[in-house]
Amino acid sequence: MERRFLGYRIASTNAISREQRNELLIARYYYMSELKRLRFDDVIFRLSSTFFISDIYVMRLLSALSEQFDLMKAERPTRESLRAKWPEWDWN
């Protein structure tokens, strides 16, 4: 049986890399803020709950990853492309 966490197949270490988590966090932030048009504080709360990290740490990550977010925003991925990359997540 294949084991997965946050949509990624995990090895025997049962961990995913921070880079993978951050990539998914940016994608979820883009989805919630740009496609669903949720308020910033609601998005931060949902990301904090989803990834089990504090809201302050979510904001620090978003600040540190702002270039990646800007690239994603320029590419304007659709829900379908996000769903294709992470099919385990709800993109509706």
Give each language-model segment a name.
Residues F5, R60-A64, N92:
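Short alpha-helical elements
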Residues M1-L24, W86-D90:
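Basic, amphipathic alpha-helix used for nucleic-acid engagement in HTH/winged-helix/SANT-Myb modules
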Residues Q68-N92:
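Short Lys/Arg-enriched helix C-cap and helix-to-coil transition segments
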Residues I53-P77:
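Major-groove recognition helix of helix-turn-helix-like DNA-binding domains
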Residues T13-S17, L35, T50:
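Conserved aromatic-histidine-acidic binding/catalytic patches
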Residues R18-D42:
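Short, amphipathic alpha-helical "recognition" segments used to contact nucleic acids or chromatin
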Residues V43-F52:
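Short alpha-helical "recognition helix" segments of helix-turn-helix
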